[in-house]
Each structure stands twice: as C-alpha cells, then as structure tokens.
Amino acid sequence: MDAPVPLSLSTLLELCTNLLQKSVNKSNGRFTAQLVHCRVIKSGLMFSVYLMNNLMNVYSKTGYALHARKLFDEMPLRTAFSWNTVLSAYSKRGDMDSTCEFFDQLPQRDSVSWTTMIVGYKNIGQYHKAIRVMGDMVKEGIEPTQFTLTNVLASVAATRCMETGKKVHSFIVKLGLRGNVSVSNSLLNMYAKCGDPMMAKFVFDRMVVRDISSWNAMIALHMQVGQMDLAMAQFEQMAERDIVTWNSMISGFNQRGYDLRALDIFSKMLRDSLLSPDRFTLASVLSACANLEKLCIGKQIHSHIVTTGFDISGIVLNALISMYSRCGGVETARRLIEQRGTKDLKIEGFTALLDGYIKLGDMNQAKNIFVSLKDRDVVAWTAMIVGYEQHGSYGEAINLFRSMVGGGQRPNSYTLAAMLSVASSLASLSHGKQIHGSAVKSGEIYSVSVSNALITMYAKAGNITSASRAFDLIRCERDTVSWTSMIIALAQHGHAEEALELFETMLMEGLRPDHITYVGVFSACTHAGLVNQGRQYFDMMKDVDKIIPTLSHYACMVDLFGRAGLLQEAQEFIEKMPIEPDVVTWGSLLSACRVHKNIDLGKVAAERLLLLEPENSGAYSALANLYSACGKWEEAAKIRKSMKDGRVKKEQGFSWIEVKHKVHVFGVEDGTHPEKNEIYMTMKKIWDEIKKMGYVPDTASVLHDLEEEVKEQILRHHSEKLAIAFGLISTPDKTTLRIMKNLRVCNDCHTAIKFISKLVGREIIVRDTTRFHHFKDGFCSCRDYW
C-alpha cells in the first residue's frame, strides 16, 4: 500500500484557512478551530498572519476571548485585523473593562475599532457611553460607517434623548448616508422611540429605497401614537410582510384597547400567510383574550400552543396565566405555575393570579400560594407586596418587604414602586426615604417607574423640592406618567402657574396628555382661580386630544367655578352634563355654597347628594355648617337632629404628625396623648403670643351657638393646632413640621398657623383634603385661596 503523499505547506495553509472560514458561524466552530490550531502548531504555520487571523476570528466569534488573546500574544506579526479581532472578542463577552484596556493599547484605531467599542457599550446597556465614544471617534478624525451609525442611533433610541438624536441625524446628512436603508431605518426607529412622529414621517417620505423594516417602523409608530387607521392603510399597501409586521399590528391594536381587531388580524395571519405565530404574537392575542374575557378563544390558543409543541415559557407562560386568571380560570393558572415554576414568571403574570383570587375574595389562597413556593424569587415577593398594596393592606406590605430584604432578596423596580405607593398612601416621609435609599443601593433609582413613584411619594409627604429632584433625574426618559405626577404635585402644593408651565412644556416636548393629566391641569386652575384658562383647557381636552370628559373632569370644573364664586355658572354646567353628576360633583357645589353662603343652592346640592348617598355625613355637616355660618342656628340644629335620628355619624376631624418614625394622632380637644399637659401649655403660650402679634380668633368658624370665650377655647384646641404644638416640643429648632388632616383646614386654623410660622421661625406644611398649605414667615402658599 502506498504511503500518503505529504501535503505541501501552501496546500495545508489553504486547507486550514478554508476550514476556518467555513466554520466561523457554525456550532462546531470552536472544535474546528482547536483541530486547526493543533495542526498549525505541528506544521509550523505560525508564520501565516492570514491563517492566524482566521483562527483568532473563529475563537472570537465563538466566545473564546482568552483563546483569541493567547493566540494574539503568540503571533510574531500582527495586522489591524488581529488587534480588532481580540478587541471584538472582549466586547462580545461584555467585558468592557478589558475591552477598554486593550483599546488603549491599539497602535492604530480605525472605524472597526471605534465601532466595536460602541457596539460593546450598547450591548450591555451603557448607551450614554456608546454615544460618547462616537463623539471621541469623530474628534479623532475617523469617519463612522453605516454600522457605527445604526448602533449609535439604537443607543440614542434607548436613552430617548431627542437632542442627541437630531445631532446624529445632521451628521448623517453631512456624510451623505441618508440614502442608506439601514441608516434610515435606524433613524425611523430613533424618532419613533423619542416620540417625534413628524420627523419619523419626514425620514420615511424621503427614503428612495424602503424595505420591510422601513414599513414596519412606520406601522409601529402609527400604533404608538394611536393612528390605527394610518397603520392599517400602510399594512394594506405592503407587498410583502414578515412576522414583525403582523406582530406590530396585533400588539398595536391590543395595547390600544382594540382587542377584537387584534384577534381579527391574528385570524387573517393564520388564513392568508405562511408564517407561524411566534411568542410575541401569542402573548398579544392571549392578552386580547384576557381583556375581552374570552376564555373559549384563549383555550383554543392554548391548545394550538400545546399541539404545535411551542415552548410554554417566558412571555407566553405569563400571558397564559394572565388570561386564565382574568377570565375566571384561576385554578388552571395555578396548575400552570405548579408545572412550570416561577423562574420565567413576570410580575404581571403572578399579580394576575393573585388578583384572580382576590377578585374571588380569597386573599388567603393568594397568601397560601406564596407561602407554598419553594424558591421565592423577586417576582413572587413583589407580586404579594403589590397585592397587599392594591388592597390597602399597607402594614402587611411593609412587613413583607422587611422580610424580603432581611432574607437577602434584592428588590426590583416593581417592588420599590409598590412600596413607594405604600409610603404615599400613609403620607410617611420616613418610610419613603428608606425606600428611596433602597432604590439607590439596588441601582433602580434611574428606573422611570421608581422615579415616578418617588415624585408622588414626596409630593404626598409634603416635600415638593425632593419631588422635583426625582423628576429632574429622568430628564431624557420621562413618560406621560412622569409629567402628570409632577403637574399634580405642583398643583397640590400651590404652584399652579408652574404646573401649567410644565404642562405647556410637556406639549412642546411632543407628549400628549391623558385624562389624568387634565385632572392635574384643572386642579392647578382651581387652586389659582384661573377660570378662563380652565375653560380653554377643558375645550382643548375635548377638541384637540379627543378625550371624552369623565365625572372627575366635570367635578373639577364645578369646583373651579364654585371656588371662584361663580355658583350660577357651576349649576348651569352641571345641568348641561351629558352624564349624571356623581357625589363628588354635587359635593363640590355644596362646598362652594358653604364658602360663599348660598343657602338656596346649597340645599339643592345637598338634597341631590343625599339621594345618591343617604348616609353621607359630609353632606349633612356641610349643610349644617352653611346654616350656622349664616346665623340660622335653628336650621343647623334640625340638620344635626336629623343626622342623629338617622344614625348618620359625622366624620371626626383628625390631624397627625410623624416624629421619630412614629405617627401621633390628635382629635379636637384631645386629652389622650401622654404629653397632653405640655402640649396644652405650649398651645396656650403660643395663643397668647400670636394674639399680641395681631391674631384675632375667628369665632365664626365655631359652628355652634356658644359663648365667645367657649368658642375661643374650642378653636385653640383644634386638632392641627395640637399636632403643631406637639411637633414644636418634640423636634429641634428650624425643623419643618408636616401635619396631615383628614378634613379641610378651617379659616381660623389657617390664619393662626400663618402667625405661628412667623412666631417660631419654622415652615409648617399642612395637607388637608384639598391641597398642601406651606406656611412660612406669616404667609401661606395658597395665598388664602383654598
């Protein structure tokens, strides 16, 4: 038998190179590379830079950065490709520290080197660094390629920073790359993510060549801004559609509440295309079934998933659990969790299951499921906390959060947002600050949902400055909730003009308000007495933003007219409402009648309110107070007697203050506090001092026919005054006092607290049922209009 003829070095070199090039993107690439590597060493082919570069490239693309680096170090000669290959290997594994270190060693940096750095930072979510690297690249005189620009635009889209995006766009025009399809598609996506549909359309209309991605981007954009008809029109124009096209249509209709249309598009996809639904398709159609409570269709989709062998995990599992939980199939949802575990379970899926049991009135079963879980991850903990928070069990939520953190579980943005909501509901600044600290430690402080919750928490706890800081923290990532939360916060704290300026800025930024935003806008107009602006915004809401007014909007407008003394206009507004006024609407009118002493209209408002809620103590009290304020003591007594006969209990006024993490509650003439003697003595001293300063007790605020001396004593012992006295003796000088009250602050307390703030040299913040009052140096932020 003849011996094999040995291969020449040139033939062996060619063979090894071909093997490597064919294996670059294959699963066995690393194995092939190792075989070739051994052959290279045995045959002494280390001299071939071309072969070594190919070998390094395989190691790099298969994730073996250390192998690539070792080979690089052994090479006698290196090219720019050699350096960039190792750089890419480090970047692909997400090791940007090593990538930066190696980048600094490069003898010469070309566009590939810089782009590798940009891609690396983008892939690990450090978008701002990716953008900065491109800036450095341009300063070095290196011209970006289309691949550089598409990755930079993706980073800009992720940060949603429009100003940066426009600068990159201008640079693209200068480079003459706006005709490139990939770059134009990236521009489309960037403008869509940044919320500028006009610029996105501008780019699309000027594209000479469009591919499926171009059309998909415009469909997604139309869906994002609620232009479903335009999205449908572009969908119909497309000669070719991919799975992204169908998903954009289905998810767009689903997210906008057009769930039947989403299911219709899904049916059309199955009927007219050869494409199979992917996990995003299935998640959207299951969500549509959940919203429509179509259990039958949901079961059919579940059956399709099982029969086609589709993997039930991730978003599909969550969508199935949500669908069954919301459609009355809670037990099926529970069995799915038992079978699949909670590894892939998202907060929405687990919360849907909890809500399913809670809707059945079975919170214990929800708790039992939680307790039975062997491996409780952050999702399980968060779902239970959210469940407690949504159902007002704040103590349980706090205790569970402490157990979670104490057990070493790190909270996520959902956990922190829920706990901040708990702190908001309790108006507890100390709890809120603790959660804020947890957000900083966990790195979730830059999450939009956490920042939005921080804005609300600080606002409700009386710290508008910290609320503004939280708002500023997410300058490039604000959503409608962010703007709305800050507008409402400013309105509640008496900064009405700032609230309206912020609203106008929001519009200029290209964001459209929702129905809650307008509640904040009307509230700002109400607190500042801006009647004409309120009318204009009401018309704008209907005509420009096409928002159908709800009872909340109508009640706000009645409150606006009523506080301004336009009682006749308020009444006419109610009469023209296309929907039946509710308790809040009539209550706003009744409250205005009490302030402006209009007995006749007040009686009408009270009667209509009591027809809706016969046991509403507030209506009886407001009418009795109206009679008392007008000197009609007998009529007031009759109202109080009818309350007694009807066993309607008047809501008692309380004020509370948090000192050293403990809440102290006070009622009128409260004698239950352990430090009552010192509190009463302090209040007596303050009373005498502010009278010397010019304070005159408003005995008309005591709505009982009593002696003036008795009235004055009652005024001195109102709950908010006692809370202030306790705060003064329990906190260091210059400490801001924050008082919460469950009823409206009376005229006398409002006047007295202005004098007290000047006397003691402190800011006193009082939150009542209508707004925050910031008392400082003898003045109040409400300007005596509340």
Curated annotation (Swiss-Prot):
This is Pentatricopeptide repeat-containing protein At2g22070. It comes from Arabidopsis thaliana (Mouse-ear cress). Residues 661-691 are annotated as: Type E(+) motif. SUPFAM superfamilies: TPR-like. Belongs to the PPR family. PCMP-H subfamily. Residues 692-786 are annotated as: Type DYW motif. One of its GO terms (molecular function) is RNA binding. Transmembrane segments: none annotated.
